[in-house]
Amino acid sequence: MIGLGAGALLGGIFLIGRVRTRPSKAALMISGIAWFVLYVIPTVKYPPSFEAMFNPEAAITYQTLLVGYTVISGISALSTIAAFSKVKKKGKMLAAAAIYLTAIAAAYFVFPDYTIENDSLLPQQTLAAWRSAVSLSMTAFWLSLGTAGGLLWSYGTKS
């Protein structure tokens, strides 16, 4: 399900954005930004919880907070890009990034922390390794999505 949504997001941004660079470079840039906005930023606030995988009550709380924060991150990024798309100045990307990060910083303090009493079912080293594996798999997903999208768009422009 995430693959379909991410692919649609990547394709929609590529079509609407009127990208002027090589398709492979554009696809990797778009997927890199999407990875940062939709995975890295929410994970900083709510790192993967092993407890939420096996406890339905903890999962509901964790998923609600994570999805809410991800939606705020995505909407903030889209609205910032939309607002700055009409600006012709050179520093518009830096200004857009600053406004996005300010909005996310505000959301970081508004959203509650995810804390449960028994979040350490695993030893800390094992939990850190598991979180690293989850992060590596999500990074590989977004990288492969950008690579595949770039190859498909390159192939589509040649025919």
Regions found by a protein language model. Give the residues of each.
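Hydrophobic core of alpha-helical transmembrane segments in multi-pass integral membrane proteins
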Residues: 70-79, 97-109
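Individual transmembrane alpha-helix segments
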Residues: 1-6
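Internal alpha-helical transmembrane segments of multi-pass membrane proteins
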Residues: 21-32, 85-102
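Short, membrane-exposed interhelical loops at transmembrane-helix boundaries
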Residues: 116-135
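Membrane-interface capping segments at transmembrane-helix boundaries
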Residues: 148-159
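Metallocofactor- and cofactor-centric catalytic cores in central/energy metabolism, strongly enriched
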Residues: 11
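Hydrophobic alpha-helical transmembrane segments of integral membrane proteins
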Residues: 19-53, 105-121
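Membrane-proximal helix-loop-helix units in multi-pass membrane proteins
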Residues: 36-92
